[in-house]
C-alpha cells in the first residue's frame, strides 16, 4: 500500500489557513498556492538519491553531491493543478511538465478527460501528479491511470487538501502510489466539495467566480 503523508510543516499550515479564508483574493490565493507547492516539494523530495560528482570551485577540485536517479515530470490536472506547477519548478527547474485535462460532470460528479500531453521520455521519469483538491478521487485516479497506460511506473500524487473518501479511492485503485497532502479535511459534502476545504480552487486561482 502506498503511503499517505500529511505535511505538517508550520509554514505550510500557516499559508494553507490564508487560502482557506473566503476573503482571500485571486492574486494572493494564486501566489500562496504556488508557495505551498514549493514547500511541499521540499518535503516530498527529502529522500531523493544523490551521487558523487567532481567539480572545480574557485579554490580547486572537490567531490560534492548532485541529484541522481530518474528525472521529474510534473503532471498538473487541468485547470487547477496549473496553480501548483511554478512552485514545484522553483525547487526543481530541470523538471519537465505534462498535462492532463479534465473537467467534472456536475451531474454525475465524475471526471471526463479531454486532453493528455506528456514528454516523450515520460516512461523514464518519475511523475508527480499535482492538483489542489483530492475530493472523490476520480480525477486523480483517471490521471494516474492515463499515465500507467503510457508505461509510467513511478508516480506520486501531491494535493493541498484531501478528503478521506478521496484518499481511500486512490489507495484502493492505485495502491502503489504515494499521496502527499497539506491537510486531511473532515469529509466530502453531497455536492462533491471538501469540508472545510477552500472552495473551488480553479475558480479562486483564475478569478473566474
Swiss-Prot record:
CDD domains: PRTases_typeI. Uracil binds at residues 194, 199-201. Binds 1 Mg(2+) ion per subunit. The magnesium is bound as Mg-PRPP. It holds the Pfam family UPRTase. Allosterically activated by GTP. 5-phospho-alpha-D-ribose 1-diphosphate binds at residues 79, 104, 131-139, 200. Its cofactor is Mg(2+). The keyword Nucleotide-binding applies. Catalyzes the conversion of uracil and 5-phospho-alpha-D-ribose 1-diphosphate (PRPP) to UMP and diphosphate. NCBIfam families: PRK00129.1, upp. This is Uracil phosphoribosyltransferase. It comes from Lactobacillus delbrueckii subsp. bulgaricus (strain ATCC 11842 / DSM 20081 / BCRC 10696 / JCM 1002 / NBRC 13953 / NCIMB 11778 / NCTC 12712 / WDCM 00102 / Lb 14). The gene is upp.
Amino acid at each position: 500500500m502506498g503511503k499517505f503523508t500529511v505535511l505538517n510543516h508550520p509554514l505550510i499550515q500557516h499559508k494553507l489557513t490564508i487560502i482557506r479564508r473566503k476573503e482571500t483574493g485571486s492574486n494572493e490565493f494564486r501566489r500562496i498556492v504556488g508557495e505551498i507547492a514549493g514547500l511541499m516539494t521540499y518535503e516530498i523530495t527529502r529522500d531523493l538519491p544523490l551521487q558523487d560528482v567532481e567539480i572545480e570551485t574557485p579554490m580547486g577540485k572537490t567531490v560534492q553531491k548532485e541529484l541522481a536517479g530518474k528525472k521529474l515530470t510534473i503532471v498538473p490536472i487541468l485547470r487547477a493543478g496549473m496553480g501548483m506547477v511554478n512552485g514545484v519548478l522553483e525547487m526543481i527547474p530541470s523538471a519537465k511538465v505534462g498535462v492532463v485535462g479534465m473537467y467534472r460532470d456536475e451531474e454525475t460528479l465524475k471526471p471526463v478527460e479531454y486532453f493528455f500531453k506528456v514528454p516523450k521520455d515520460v516512461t523514464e521519469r518519475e511523475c508527480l501528479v499535482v492538483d489542489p483538491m483530492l475530493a472523490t478521487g476520480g480525477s486523480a485516479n483517471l490521471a494516474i491511470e492515463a499515465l500507467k497506460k503510457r508505461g509510467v511506473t513511478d508516480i506520486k500524487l501531491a494535493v493541498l487538501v484531501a478528503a478521506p473518501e478521496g484518499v481511500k479511492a486512490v489507495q484502493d485503485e492505485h495502491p502503489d502510489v504515494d499521496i502527499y497532502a497539506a491537510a486531511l479535511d473532515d469529509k466530502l459534502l453531497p455536492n462533491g466539495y471538501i469540508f472545510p476545504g477552500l472552495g473551488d480552487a480553479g475558480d479562486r486561482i483564475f478569478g473566474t467566480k
